[in-house]
Amino acid sequence: MKNLAYYVGQEKKDSDDVIGDQYDGVMLMQDMQINIKDIATKNVLVSINAPKATMDFGYMKYPVFCMFRYDERNKLSETTEDGQELFGFSPEQVRYMPEFGDSVLVIKDADEFIRRVATALQKEGLIHARGNVRYFDGNDLEYFQDVKDEPVHTAFWKRKKYSYQQEFRILIDKPIEDHYILNMVLKL
């Protein structure tokens, strides 16, 4: 697992905005007015217009395992006459999929996979957070409230332009410089 800083670096370094998001793991605020006030008088000393401002809560060095989640969002149509449901990839997913590599890992029993990850992390004395990534557009109040209540959720929000990724993430509470390898039991 790479840390969040790795993915941020993908867009900053290579202008790769397919995989990397330069605002991943931080709270992004757009078109903000920042006021600097005198502590004693509460008078505004300086007012600055900021097209973009970020707050970093310290999760950039945390390792994250990112997965595409194939789910009801991939449903192509209503149930067919014979009771089958048709699923497929969106044109955007088809266009960007090759950017993520030439291999795919299919997890058939997601609950069992998560249980094994949690067990392996517990054996190593590590805490983790997991969940679907949510996507926001502009100054989204739900996004701000969620991150205010749980700052670690900055790792579980991305800009709406990345919604085709349909990500599920596991974030480990252990700052690292580059990558982390979790030893766990898998049945093949």
PLM features per residue range, with description:
Residues 1-188:
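NAD-dependent ADP-ribosyltransferases
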